[in-house]
Amino acid sequence: MTNFDLLKLLMDKKVADSFQFFTSCQYKLDMAELSYNALKNLIKKYQEEETEVINKVFEDAKRTGKGTYKLHKNVVDFFGIEIDTTVAIEKVFMEIMGLLHNFFDTFAQWINSSLFGEQALPIKRASLVNVINKMSAFPEYTDQFITDFTNITANQNYSYVADFNNTQKHRYQLYVQNKFDLFSVQGEVSIQEFEKDGRSGSFVALSPKRELL
C-alpha cells in the first residue's frame, strides 16, 4: 500500500479528519495555559499593591499616630489601554473558561472522528453528550481513558465550566470579587456565586484553574 492509498483509506474511513480536532484541542489548552499564567500574574500584582498600601497605613499610624486608608485604583496596561486590574482579571478568567468550554466541544469531535470512523456522528450532532452516548455502541473500547471520558459530564470541574459559560451566555454576567483584609493583610480573588439547575458554583479564582487545565 502506498502512502497515497493509506491516506485515501484513512480519509474514506473518516479517521484522517481526527487530526485537525486533536491539534485544535492542544491549541486551546495551550491558550488557556497562557491565560492562566496571565491571571496568576494579575492576581499577584493586585495583592502586592494592596499589601504595600495597607502596610503604609500601619507604618504611618505607628510613626505619626494616624494611618489613613485612601480609596485608590489598581490599573494595568493592556497594550496601551489602561484598565482596572479587576476588569483585567475578569477578562482573562472569561478567556480561560471560554477556551475550556470550546475544548470540550472539540474534544468530542476528536473522539467522534478518531474512534467511530465511518459510523461517526455528523459534525453538527457530535456534541459531548451525544458522543458519550454513542460510545456504548463500541464495547471494544474498554480502558480507563474511555471510562474517564464517558464519566466526564459527571465531573465537578466540567460541570463548573459548563454552568459558568451557560450562565454567562444565557442569564447574567458573573463578576470577579476582590477582597482584602486590612488587619491580616491578606487578599482573596473569587468568582461570584451562582446556581444553575440546582448546582451551585463558587470558588477562588486562581487555585482551581490549574486542576481544570
Regions found by a protein language model. Give the residues of each.
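Acidic, Ser/Thr/Gly/Pro-rich intrinsically disordered interaction regions
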Residues: 1-98, 108-213
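Active-site hotspot residues in diverse enzymes, especially metal/ion-binding acidic/histidine motifs
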Residues: 103
